[in-house]
Amino acid sequence: MEHIFFCTGHELKIPNIVKSKGLYLYDEQGKGYMDLESGVWCTSLGHNNAEINRIIKNQIDLLMHAGFCYSHAILEKSAKSILRIAGFNNGKSVFLCSGSEAIEISRQISKHLTEKSVSMTLHDSYLGAYSSITDKSRNWFLLDWEQCKICHDKDTCNLSCEVLQTIPKDISDFIFEPGSSSGFVRFPPKALINNIVKIVRDNGGKIVANEVTTGIGRTGKWFGYQHYDITPDFIAVGKGIGNGYPVSIALINEPTTRQLTLKPFHYAQSHQNDPLGASIVNGVIQYIEENNLISIAADNGLLLHKHLESLVDNEFITEVRGRGLMFAIDIKNEEITDSIYNNLIEKGYIVGNRGSSFRLDPPLIITKTEIEGFIEMLRESTSLFK
């Protein structure tokens, strides 16, 4: 691919994929690959999902793009669906194109309403690709929670904790990524997050749940923040909600929308509230509900976790972390990681290679048989290097 500028930092291993179906990709020789990353954690219902394809084709035949002065009824229908599953009754939503944008508009609205200047997140969060987020040299407070992982009081800590005492009072928004941690799948203690939320809220700040990766069933619940005792003001949704189509949503709770009626906010983008993206969002939610995929993902996640834990030997595989169908497998030796990764691809299995770990985010439709087949191949690949 001579004329494509690749700047993701990831090596292109299979350049000749020609078709896909469900968990599987096929190259021009007909070789199949089980995609255990769901693309870039996006195809939650599998590649080439027939029902989602039907919805896309139907909407394209009606209206796929809308201008500023006209719209389509699918917007309101889809907004009601996603606000319902979030429990944001009487809230509002903005349909956008990427998770980065859903985070960005949530930050902008927070600063607009609170008139505070500093955004806050945990030190290992990934929040998007915009420079306003990647450059955290000013107007950001990063809370380093490394010591909280091993703290004896991590499950019972209170507001007197020295780590919490460092939080400034001028926080406009605390953006919480409930588990992805830049792809390394780390779960901050519940008490820590609950205390941060209380401090920020007591000082007039907003809470943003970054559910771009962890949302839409990925963690065995609709949203990752539901594993914590918090209710956010904003929810940023992306990736899996489009099943591979670039659509995202910023959800806004009712109290915040009431504030916006008194203090209006302006934001305009070419593909904001497009009917095509909205129709896909509505279809993905409907498909998940009709096929009970949240519960199935939770159950299959427990099975996958059990099998992965059985591979931990402290020689090569040192730790497994996961929730629902989102896992990290820590490998002791990066050279061995690359060798196992290449062997898995050769055998027809795609996982995420993070150097010191593998990342698994299979589609929610993965079956127990497919899980057990992958585990057997991972066990075989690992044994080659012992």
Give each language-model segment a name.
Residues 1-386:
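Conserved N-terminal phosphate-binding loop of PLP-dependent enzymes in the Aspartate aminotransferase
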